[in-house]
Every structure is written in C-alpha cells, then in structure tokens.
Amino acid sequence: MAFEKTRQFLPPLHFVLFPFMAQGHMIPMVDIARILAQRGVTITIVTTPHNAARFKDVLNRAIQSGLHIRVEHVKFPFQEAGLQEGQENVDFLDSMELMVHFFKAVNMLENPVMKLMEEMKPKPSCLISDFCLPYTSKIAKRFNIPKIVFHGVSCFCLLSMHILHRNHNILHALKSDKEYFLVPSFPDRVEFTKLQVTVKTNFSGDWKEIMDEQVDADDTSYGVIVNTFQDLESAYVKNYTEARAGKVWSIGPVSLCNKVGEDKAERGNKAAIDQDECIKWLDSKDVESVLYVCLGSICNLPLAQLRELGLGLEATKRPFIWVIRGGGKYHELAEWILESGFEERTKERSLLIKGWSPQMLILSHPAVGGFLTHCGWNSTLEGITSGVPLITWPLFGDQFCNQKLIVQVLKAGVSVGVEEVMKWGEEESIGVLVDKEGVKKAVDEIMGESDEAKERRKRVRELGELAHKAVEEGGSSHSNIIFLLQDIMQQVESKS
C-alpha cells in the first residue's frame, strides 16, 4: 500500500528495455516488460523488426488487456557489419567469427537509438539493458538516467564471474583447459575447468575487446535484475547482492507471468505444433511417464551425436517428446529419422517437434516426469518451476554453471556426463561425447524408482512450490519488484 500511495504523487515511470537479439535473452525480457507494465509502468521495448515479430502476438494480447507497452524498431545494420540479410538473431549464426560481426552490428545501433530516445515521451526514467549491449551505458549517461543490467543467468553464475574477474591469477595458474579448480569464497565446494566459466580471460583478440566492453558497462551500471528467486539459491543471491553494493533485484521466475495457454504456448515464438494436438498426446500418457528432450535454440551437435541421443531415447522404452531445432542439422537428422526406421519404431510413444516448442505448456503437464536439457537458465528455471527433475547436457556459456547448481547444489537432476565445452563452429571435430547407453542410464536414473530418484522428485516439487510462492503477493520476488520501482521513483523525484 505504501508503494501505491507514493506512486500517485509522481509522474508515471517509463522504462526502456533493450533485449539482446538471441531467443534465450529476449524471452525473459518480454516477460519482465509485462510484469513491470502490470505495476503501472509505461514500457518501451527497443529491438529490430525481425526480432519484434517473434513476440508480436504475446505483446498484442498484453496491450489489449490494457498494459502500456510499445515496441520501437531500429534497422539492423547487417550489411555494414558483413552479415547476410535476415541475420538479425543469434539463432541464424553458426560460428564465433559471425558473432564478432554480429556484435559489430549491435554497437552500430547506438546513434539511431540515441535519436529515438530524444523523441520518446514520456521522458524515460530508467533503462533495462541486456549485458550484451554495452552501448546502452552511453545512452543512459547521455540522458542522465539509471541503467539496470539484465544478464539472463543465475546468481550462482554471476557470483562465479564476479569472483573470477577479480582473481585472474587462479585461471592463469592452470596447467591446461581441462584442469579443475575451486572458486574461492563460494558458498559451496564446486569445481570447474577454465572453459566452463564465462570470464573475459578466456578470450583474445576481437572477443576480448567485446568482453571488456561488456564487463566495464556492467561494473558501472546502477544495478542488476536477476531472473531467480531467493529460496532457490539464497546464499548466492546474498553474496552477489553484497558484491554489488545491494543493487540486485531477484524477480523470478519471470516465466510465471504467463498465465493463459496462448502465452505459455507462444512464449518466445510461434510453436511448430498445434497446442491442442500437443495436449491431446500428453493427456494419453500416464502421470510422470514422459521424458521431454530439448537442447535449446542454438544446438549444433553433430549428426553422429544426435543419432546416439535418438537411439538412447529409443532404448529407454519410455514415451518421449523430442524437440529438433531447424537449420542444416535438422535436415540431416530428419533424413536419418525417416530412413533408419527410428520414427516408425518409436511412433507409438514419441512426439517429434520440428522447430519451436511450446515448452512451458509441455513442462507444466502432469504426464511429464523428466526434462533432458542443455541447461540454459530459462529452461532450467522452467523445469524447476514445473517441478520436473532434470537431466543436464550443457553445451557452452553459463550452462556448465547451471549444471553444477542443478546437480551438486540443488540436487534436482543428474548429469548425462558432458564436461567438455562445445566450441561454436567446431562441433564436428569434438564428435560424440555421450553414447546411447549413457543417455539411457541418465534417463533411467532420473525416472526410475530408486530412493534417490524419489527423493530428487520430492525435492524438485518443493522447489517448484517455492517458485510460485516467490512471485505471489508477499513473496520475495514480488516484493523485490516493489523495491526496484521505489528505488527508481526516488531517483526521478531527486531530479525533479
């Protein structure tokens, strides 16, 4: 109530949101936009036309419900940066070299965005920017407004990055990329290899310059929003908040703002399967009998590895949903699925989704009893929020951090056994890391009837209940949104 009373005596807050052009970054940012708009904040999302089209339907429903959200388009300078037309999203890139060009294009957005901001009404009160868009720091400075960073990762990961950026000597002392080390001052004893942590010392050349810009912009930002909740990783939230002088607001799981079926089904993109067809298939299966398999929107595993995954799923003799991403690998895999007889042999107990999956809708169905995931933070949270135990198959980035949080700290899943980081564009040379027996073993471990499996399921269900409580009135995440808005209101008031 105190917040609402304060709200009446000030001009409306206007937050400008800058999502990075990658599906895993855009999805939670759109959720954050809706959560803030539900509190009476005017929201402007700045993105490119291609990326805006991905969340058009979800936002249109939000706008029709009375929320003050608008989307401003800026042209993506693909040609000037050496990219092909349509390469406006990381989904369409397949190498680290192209990513360098992509970041070059991103930084070219500074001037058109500056002009856009000059014309915005009402005057922006605050920027929320993805960590990967350091140019927004210059925008915030130019207009004398606070910039809040959104990373899209866990506090577990953020704390490890914060500590290691200030203790470079630990990584420099390692004799090889495969040698394990402990992160000092960490709440739990967790070992990493050098490549399993996302720190700027792992990069050189153009990539080091990109990372330096991002870290510097992060260090000078006003604060950080994290898509997590207090009861999930309390020690890491506490330590990271202290490291950032208190300006950290954990407001997740933001996915829980998706209440209706359409929002769940279309979160991130239009689903490649009819919602009713998907639900009908799940309704025909026993409770907790289905394994859901999705390795993310940027999975470039070689065909040989995908074949082993498929054969492992077949060997489990359990019903499964397998999401197969688009692109070149899809055509190769689709050919194998058809010609090898895999689809025919498993058709009575499998559902293959070729493209974007209605993941939230699937995970929240009672028939789903396990989730084989790449450990992207969005997917990790969606699985935990739905009370579904996880099988971890990390590929790169923060995903190895998330695996260790899931398996070692939360004890909410089991690892499929992957410890080697996939280097973008070099997947074929890495080859097969998990054979079909390894896949079957992990699935049986997570979905079996051992005491450990039962305890794990109980633990994940409890975490799922805590996730829902966090976003309800009086919950930690619900309260943190109020604290965030009060903080920004005080900033506005001090300048008026």
UniProtKB/Swiss-Prot annotation:
Is Transmembrane set as a keyword in this record?
no
Source species: Arabidopsis thaliana
- The UniProt record lists the keyword Nucleotidyltransferase: no
Q: What is this protein called?
A: UDP-glycosyltransferase 73C2
Database matches in Pfam families:
UDPGT
Binding positions for UDP-alpha-D-glucose per the UniProt entry: 297, 357-359, 374-382, 396-399
Task: State the InterPro entries in the record.
Answer: UDP_glucos_trans (IPR002213), UDP_glycos_trans_CS (IPR035595)
Question: Molecular function terms in GO for this entry?
Answer: glucosyltransferase activity; UDP-glycosyltransferase activity
Q: What is its EC number?
A: 2.4.1.-
Q: Which SUPFAM superfamilies match?
A: UDP-Glycosyltransferase/glycogen phosphorylase
Q: Which UniProt keywords apply?
A: Glycosyltransferase, Transferase
Q: Write out the similarity annotation.
A: Belongs to the UDP-glycosyltransferase family.
